A protein has these predicted regions:
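Active-site neighborhood of HAD-like aspartate-dependent phosphohydrolases
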Residues: 1-49
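C-terminal cap/substrate-recognition subdomain and adjoining C-terminal extension
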Residues: 4, 75-76, 82-130, 144-222
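Conserved alpha/beta cores of soluble small-molecule-handling proteins
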Residues: 30-32, 52, 71, 90-94, ...
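Helix-loop "lid/cap" segments that line or gate small-molecule binding pockets
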Residues: 44-49, 56-65
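Short histidine/acidic/glycine/proline-rich micro-motifs that form metal-
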Residues: 47, 81-82
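Acidic catalytic patch
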Residues: 66-74
């Protein structure tokens, strides 16, 4: 059977929540603290499961980024990834490199905004060796090696208006819980054809882990 590997991002491939890290990077610590203080009551209700996770997340996101051009937002996302390689778990990177040759497909399935998840995948998780993007790249090309299997990103997408600015809303459902399974099935609909290995670390990954043939909870922590 064709093997598919699907990974949660925050807390599974990374050491930390990248939403908080990205807001701090993009807006600075003072503005970040002021914004979260404003929404503290809402976040408490969310933790108590009295307010939907996706609504709280969308309100916080809108507070910081509504009205920003998509071009500016994407530039910040790329810069954030370039400065945040340390957030990735070394064991996760090593595992991805190890299983890539046997994989039919690999995906990061994340509630985080895909605009900042994708640069992490492109910069750090696409080559078969951490050095391939530099000194070994020309050697690989000269030997006509088959390109390494890319990791696709299935994340939460932002809504953009006609002027190319972020509305503060999400264009897709928050990629959390059951939505993770729906997003996987939208790309690979014939479940019986695949052997799925899933990796996650939180309640938001429960359905994805249950969907998989092999499920790994809180991996890569060694």
């Amino acid at each position: 059977m064709k093997k598919i590997f699907v990974f949660d991002f925050d807390g599974t491939l990374t050491h930390a929540d990248t939403l908080l890290a990205f807001i701090r990077f993009a807006c600075g610590p003072v503005r970040m603290c002021m914004g979260f203080a404003l929404y503290a009551p809402l976040l408490v209700l969310m933790k108590l499961k009295l307010y939907p996770n996706y609504k709280a997340k969308q309100k916080v996101f809108a507070h910081f980024f509504r009205g920003m051009t998509l071009a500016r937002f994407d530039a910040l996302c790329t810069a954030f990834a370039q400065h945040s390689e340390h957030l990735l778990r070394p064991a996760a990177r090593s595992f991805i490199n190890t299983v890539r040759p046997e994989a039919y497909a690999m995906a990061i399935v994340s509630a985080s905004i895909d605009n900042w998840v994708r640069p992490f995948a492109e910069l750090y998780l696409q080559s078969s060796n951490p050095q391939d993007n530099s000194q070994n790249k020309s050697q690989s090309n000269s030997q006509n090696h088959k390109p390494s299997l890319p990791i696709i990103v299935l994340g939460t997408k932002v809504e953009v208006d006609a002027a190319g600015c972020l509305t503060g809303r999400f264009a897709t459902p928050n990629c959390y819980g059951p939505e993770k399974v729906r997003r996987i099935e939208a790309v690979w609909p014939h479940r019986e054809q695949y052997d799925v290995s899933a990796f996650g670390d939180s309640r938001g990954d429960k359905e994805m882990l249950a969907y998989a043939d092999q499920a790994y909870f809180k991996p890569f922590r060694f």
